[in-house]
């Protein structure tokens, strides 16, 4: 099968080059709100985010970051065709702000947006993604109730646009030639990824 690829190196806030309802599949992974490495990026999009972080208003910053992400999700919803699929890799964040440690559930906010905009959830994937270096817990982190569950998973959220599935020609040759073997189907469609390792991520910020 011959494929053609076109790359747009630009912000996804405005995908004006792509017609509405023209994309069958979107696979993406955004910056994760409340992960410190992305604070500067989110703050550049909305000055209120920087202020909220400086004032230790974690919940406010979290909600404002997702308001920015929602602009991208709105564009994704626009270009996705009815029955099309969007897959989003996103992890939750844990963070201590002004002596309060808590979880920021990014996957909940993303799911909330797509449900509000008429997409439906399909079974998602839990990506068991241990950190690349062993973590040492010392001091109060070894004592109840200060010891907390280690966050070592991310989500692959899967949504369909609308309740109707895409329609195909009966006995479509291309479709049936793409059928999975039984062993492949069981492995590739597992709802837990255990053997796919993540890689360290760095920002190349020029000062």
Name every feature range the model reports, one short phrase each.
Residues 1-207:
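Core catalytic lobe of class I
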């Amino acid at each position: 099968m011959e494929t053609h690829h076109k790359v747009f190196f630009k912000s996804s806030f405005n995908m004006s080059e792509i017609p509405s309802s023209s994309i069958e599949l979107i696979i993406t992974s955004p910056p994760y709100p409340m992960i410190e490495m992305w604070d500067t990026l989110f703050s550049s999009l909305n000055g209120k985010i920087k202020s909220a972080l400086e004032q230790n208003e974690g919940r406010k910053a979290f909600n404002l970051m997702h308001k920015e992400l929602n602009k991208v999700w709105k564009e994704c919803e626009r270009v996705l065709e009815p029955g099309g699929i969007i897959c989003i890799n996103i992890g939750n964040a844990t963070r201590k702000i002004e002596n309060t440690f808590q979880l920021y559930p990014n996957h909940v906010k993303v799911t909330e947006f797509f449900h509000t905009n008429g997409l439906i959830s399909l079974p998602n994937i839990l990506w068991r993604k241990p950190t690349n270096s062993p973590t040492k817990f010392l001091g109060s982190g070894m004592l109840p109730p200060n010891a907390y569950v280690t966050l070592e998973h991310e989500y692959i959220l899967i949504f369909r646009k609308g309740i109707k599935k895409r329609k195909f020609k009966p006995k479509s040759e291309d479709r049936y030639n793409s059928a999975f073997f039984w062993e492949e189907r069981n492995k590739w469609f597992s709802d837990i990824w255990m053997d796919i390792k993540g890689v360290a991520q760095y920002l190349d910020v020029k000062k």
